[in-house]
Amino acid sequence: DLIRKKQDVLAKWMALEVGKPLAEGKAEAGGSADIFEWNSEETKRIYGQTVESRFEDTRVHVYYQPIGVVAALTPWNFPLVLSARKISTALAAGCSVIVKPDVITPGTVMELVDICRESGVPPGVVNLLSGDPPSIASQLISSDIIKKISLTGSTRVGKLILKQAADKVQRVTMELSGHAPFIVFDDANIEKATDMAIAAKFRNNGQVCISPSKFYIQNSKKKDFVNLFVEKTKKLKIGNGMDADVQLGPMTTKKRLTEIEELVEKTKQEGAKVLLGGKRPSGFNKGFYYEPTIFDDVTDEFTIMKQEPFGPLCPMLSFETFDEVIKRANNHELGLASYICTNSMEQAHRASEQIETGTVAVNTPLVAIAEAPFGGIKQTGYGREGGSMAIKDYLNVKYTHLGIKG
């Protein structure tokens, strides 16, 4: 309840630290509250087992115990909801937690930690450490106190953390980089498909691990989809996230803006046609703003199809057959999220089963919700956050073989 009551404060923190529009910040606060509510109910569903023993004079009991202190390492792009996932799951499992936010977003996470304490969480149960990321992460992972690590970050950082955690055989949950395909079949409603693409792609200006980053449109619908997508994207308002009607804020850092500009130039050099954007917007002398950019004449060999854009860049490609697009979409080392637009239930099921990602959104832009397990496969990591599966990663399994005769 306190998260919802303080959603305006939390949204302002995210607007100031990330550049996120206020409406998106409020939505993130609502999603964070949902996650706390879900995990508060999960405490009732940590079921043990009584197993029939093969011996008549013994009994077998299986139960769960808290794993211990958790180190939660969170990124800057969704500082509130990603911290909420880790903190609420740890609390539900009976674990204390030390949160290390990104150096860009300590204020947002500090506000959440204060809300936990204000809600009655005992002192020392939810803690925050902010500062130099490599130093703090190394100290946490090398500590004998830490029994579990939960990381949301890049695949590069995940591999480094995993190597360090291996020394102590610490349990690790990792949600890492993504490169999400957005597939539009020829039976899809193009009006709805473009709305879905806008909502999924431009959340946090594309600085999202589940943001669609390669658009595959079946041949007969490509022209109509691209034209309508360009038309709708033009109408998005860019500006200061603190302004109520803004839909797209800036890139969060100068480094992020520079990387986007370099990738755009690389894509153009490789032969892509810019249909929209491709530059900083006029009238913005300050800030790290960049226009939503839509490319055509892109092939699967382009750099942008291999490197996670993590920004408002949209390469458009075409395909002929179902088997072809699934094969092309799966031809990547990352596997976090994918999006499918189709009016065929049979095609929706086949695509969901065959595409190699941990989460699939069919005819909806929503991927991560409180009641479902969120995470990836391949080099996107392992373990899940959300749903009924997440809490098991914060628990140890123990069984007792009990003799009942003296």
Q: For each of these PLM feature ranges, what is it?
A:
Residues 1-8, 22-46:
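Long amphipathic alpha-helix in the N-terminal Rossmann-like dinucleotide-binding domain
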Residues 13-21, 51-57, 177, 243-249:
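Short linear capping/connector segments at secondary-structure termini
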Residues 14, 36, 94, 126, ...:
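Residue-level signal for inorganic ion chemistry
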Residues 36, 86, 112, 161, ...:
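Aromatic/hydrophobic pocket-lining residues that form π-stacking "cages" and hydrophobic walls in ligand
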Residues 48-192, 319:
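Rossmann-like NAD(P) dinucleotide-binding subdomain of oxidoreductase/dehydrogenase enzymes
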Residues 123, 176-178, 208-210, 244-245, ...:
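Short glycine-enriched loop/turn motifs at secondary-structure junctions
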Residues 146, 183, 237, 264, ...:
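Conserved C-terminal structural/oligomerization subdomain of aldehyde/semialdehyde dehydrogenase
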Residues 156-299, 362, 406:
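ALDH superfamily catalytic-core signature
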